[in-house]
Swiss-Prot record:
Enzyme Commission code(s) on record: 1.1.1.1
Record InterPro entries: ADH-like_C, ADH-like_N, ADH_Zn_CS, GroES-like_sf, NAD(P)-bd_dom_sf
Organism (species): Pseudomonas sp
Top-level EC class: oxidoreductase
Essential cofactor(s): Zn(2+)
Family: Belongs to the zinc-containing alcohol dehydrogenase family.
Binding site for Zn(2+) 2: C68, C71, C74, C82
Name the record gives this protein: Probable alcohol dehydrogenase
The keyword Methyltransferase appears for this protein: no
Gene Ontology CC terms: cytosol
Key word Ribosomal protein present: no
Record note on cofactor: Binds 2 Zn(2+) ions per subunit.
Catalytic activity: a primary alcohol + NAD(+) = an aldehyde + NADH + H(+); a secondary alcohol + NAD(+) = a ketone + NADH + H(+)
UniProt entry keywords in alphabetical sequence: Metal-binding, NAD, Oxidoreductase, Zinc
């Protein structure tokens, strides 16, 4: 990572917290501690290196994940599947040095997702910054950070990975930021039914406010039976699993319609968790099961689809 590509970014508010940050804090995902985490940041560019071409001091930006920019995946606009994704986002230090963070003689891990945005200042490459243009110039910049991870994961899964079509039914499992972003995207795509399964009553209410047509309390209702009831025995055409719970994923498969498509974005609490999937069920129903990272998004998607939709009032901050 050439030093000339680096830039300094001044954050105007605290970065948002993602479950990935919490997973590292709790030891679920490996990352050397102590560390400065954070990867849903937004702010104002303060200074740029001589190699920066498209950004200047004063520009408002959203920070997203890092990628190498030159492997086969990156060249085909699939940077979330960068062949060097681990090193780019979880290496804890810049590849070219020097050490960015320290306390006394102790080195502090940083450069998390190419940014470490839980700080007043952060260093990032131009490649993983998205300039906020006039389409959202009236939106508080501190609300735009999730566009770089949570929102693009949920919305991208709907618009890119699943390519959800109008008039179809869509099931969201988990009503957090990712799931609610998927709800808004499904509404934008014109889904006839948007069903959200979420144990929190407050989140179920929020899902309805953002476009869900029905909600399910999985703690007190049978998920598969309710989906079949709502869809008149057809099952759902599309589903997005956001919880990371194996049992929920298995129920999602049982809730699918013929030729249904299920995308999985939730990381399980135990990384070695496995799900019981019947090959016969997949064959008989013609199901498609896919894993998705960052909503298959790239910088182009983040800067156009999400921001334009935000201007139209489709994407609202799930406060």
């Amino acid at each position: 990572m050439p030093r000339r590509e680096m830039m300094k970014c001044l954050f105007v508010s605290e970065s948002c917290v993602c479950h990935t940050d919490l997973a590292i804090k709790d030891g679920v995902l490996p990352f050397p501690l102590p560390a400065v985490l954070g990867h849903e940041g937004s702010g104002i560019v303060e200074a740029v290196g001589p190699g920066v071409k498209h950004l200047k001091p004063g520009d408002a930006v959203v920070m997203t994940f890092a990628s190498c920019g030159h492997c086969a995946s990156c060249e085909h606009e699939r940077p979330s599947y960068c062949l060097d994704f681990g090193a780019q986002n979880y290496s804890a230090q810049r590849a070219d040095g020097p050490v960015l963070l320290s306390q006394g003689d102790e080195v502090i891990s940083g450069f998390f997702f190419g940014q470490s945005s839980f700080s007043s200042m952060a260093m990032a490459r131009e490649h993983n910054l998205v300039k906020i243009d006039a389409l959202v110039d009236d939106a508080p910049i501190e609300l735009l950070g999730p566009l770089g991870c949570g929102v693009q994961t949920g919305a991208g899964a709907v618009m890119i990975s699943l390519d959800v079509r109008a008039g179809r039914s869509f099931l969201v499992l988990g009503g957090g930021a990712v799931g609610l972003s998927a709800v808004m995207a499904a509404k934008l795509r014109g889904c006839s039914r948007i069903i959200v399964s979420e144990p929190s009553a407050a989140k179920r209410e929020q899902a309805l406010a953002l476009g869900a047509t029905e909600v399910i309390d999985p703690l007190n209702e049978n998920l598969v039976e309710r989906v079949q009831q709502i869809t008149e025995g057809q099952g759902c055409d599309y589903a997005l699993e956001c919880t990371g719970l194996v049992s929920v994923m298995e129920q999602a498969i049982d809730s699918m319609a013929m030729r249904g498509q299920l995308a999985v974005v939730g990381v399980p609490p135990k990384l070695d968790a496995t799900a019981a999937v019947s090959p016969l069920a997949l064959i008989q129903k013609g199901l498609k099961l896919m894993g998705v990272i960052e909503g298959d998004s790239c910088r182009v998607y983040s800067s156009t689809s999400c921001t334009r939709s935000s201007r139209l009032g489709v994407f609202r901050s799930p406060r």
